Design a protein with these regions (language model features):
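Alpha-helical cap/lid subdomain in secreted, periplasmic
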Residues: 1-126
Length: 126
């Protein structure tokens, strides 16, 4: 079994008031909760966390707010550090294509790119 957790780009919205470290702390809490659930048959769960692609430079809108580009840059580094500390796997989805409407949701091609990355990595983790 493999549990895959990917927090979305929405977490960098200004209204949530979370910086990359806070978003990372949220991911770490999720990992710890997943590990504490009694459904793994007495074994340590096999977990993969995925960092979303970074929001591209110059993007700003009312929904995301100021600082979303900068905050999104720090999430992958936080997730990578948290993955190492919690002995779980890490994948950076950077390079998967965002749509040009809200710059936070993947396009059809972006989903295919993420699927390719996962298809390559997941068999090595099972």
């Amino acid at each position: 079994d493999l549990l895959i957790i990917m927090l979305g780009t929405n977490d960098v919205k200004e209204r949530f008031g979370a910086n990359a470290a806070c978003i990372g702390a949220g991911m770490e809490r999720l990992i710890q909760k997943c590990k504490s659930v009694d459904c793994w048959g007495g074994k340590e769960p096999n977990i993969l966390i995925v960092a979303p692609p970074r929001i591209k430079e110059g993007f700003h809108d009312e929904v995301m707010g100021d600082g979303c580009v900068e905050k999104s840059r720090g999430v992958a580094a936080q997730f990578q550090m948290i993955a190492a500390r919690n002995h779980v796997h890490f994948l950076d989805a950077e390079g998967c294509e965002f749509n040009q409407i809200d710059f936070m949701h993947l396009t059809r091609h972006g989903h295919a790119q993420l699927a390719e990355k996962l298809a390559e990595l997941v068999p090595t983790l099972l």
